[in-house]
Curated annotation (Swiss-Prot):
Protein name, UniProt field: SPbeta prophage-derived uncharacterized protein YomH
Highest taxon in the source lineage: Bacteria
Listed InterPro entries: Phage_tail-like_C (IPR048276)
Species in which this protein is naturally found: Bacillus subtilis (strain 168)
Length: 252
């Protein structure tokens, strides 16, 4: 729970480093966002009175954030807090009640400083956050696939399907195939990879880089990125290499 947390971390800086603690300025029961709003895109046809759902999109939402600063409201620290909050992109935000749950947040609207004309006071602001919450990024150890084939089991304990990123170092010239046997999808395939060439795949950003050709490697891959479904996934690696996998759980 956000408002039960004593402190929080934003942009990898804990609030207590600035003398700030999370506070609730409202009385009574606490109200917090549970699930993000959804936008439903529909199509109506001339012959049917019922709409067809084209897609459903979760929208970013806003959360209020108030923190108290005790004995640190001098000009130097106020400027430091302002720099801390002055970001131009979504940054990780987590709360001490569970630091393993991460929001991606951006301060918006006016930021108010309420004080007692001394060195105490609190800051009131609004954070715009992604519609999903995330776990810490997980990176596996290096798997030895020099035998040419290996099955790896990964459990997705989140609420939705997530992309699987990876990095591998090829042993000998040849091809590499990565397939989720739990899903019926086209495998991710690399062709003509050189001995000791290192390939990085960021499935979130749809970016693939090579230690030899940089970004000029898309002719060697079919760009069928691997997806991890909820529950257990069996990942099959074909081709001699060393490989490690990267993923981040996603929560509603």
């Amino acid at each position: 729970m956000i408002r039960e947390s004593q402190y929080f971390m934003f942009n990898n800086i804990p609030s207590y480093e600035l003398g700030a603690v999370n506070v609730n300025t409202e009385g009574g029961l606490l109200e917090e966002s549970f699930i993000a709003n959804r936008t439903v895109n529909e199509t109506y046809t001339r012959l049917s009175s019922e709409p067809y759902v084209d897609n459903v999109k979760l929208e970013p939402y806003e959360i209020p954030l108030n923190f108290y600063i005790e004995n640190h409201l001098d000009e130097k620290n106020v400027r430091r807090v302002a720099r801390w909050l002055n970001v131009d992109d979504y940054k990780p935000l987590s709360f001490s009640r569970n630091l393993d749950i991460i929001y991606f947040a951006l301060p918006i609207n006016a930021t108010d400083l309420v004080h007692n004309c001394s060195n105490d006071g609190y800051v009131k602001l609004t954070m715009k956050v992604f519609p999903y919450k995330y776990g810490q990024e997980t990176t596996t150890h290096w798997f030895d696939v020099t035998s040419g084939v290996k099955n790896i089991e990964i459990e997705n304990i989140g609420d939705v399907d997530i992309p699987l990123s990876l990095e591998f170092k090829k042993i000998g010239d040849g091809d590499i195939t990565v397939e989720n046997l739990t899903l019926y999808r086209t495998p991710l395939k690399f062709t003509g990879i050189k001995h000791h060439e290192v390939i990085n795949v960021d499935s979130n950003k749809k970016l693939i880089t090579s230690s030899i050709s940089g970004y000029e490697c898309y002719d060697q891959v079919n760009e069928e990125y691997v997806i991890l479904t909820r529950g257990k996934n069996r990942i099959k690696i074909n081709g001699e290499c060393y490989i490690r996998l990267k993923y981040r759980y996603k929560y509603l």
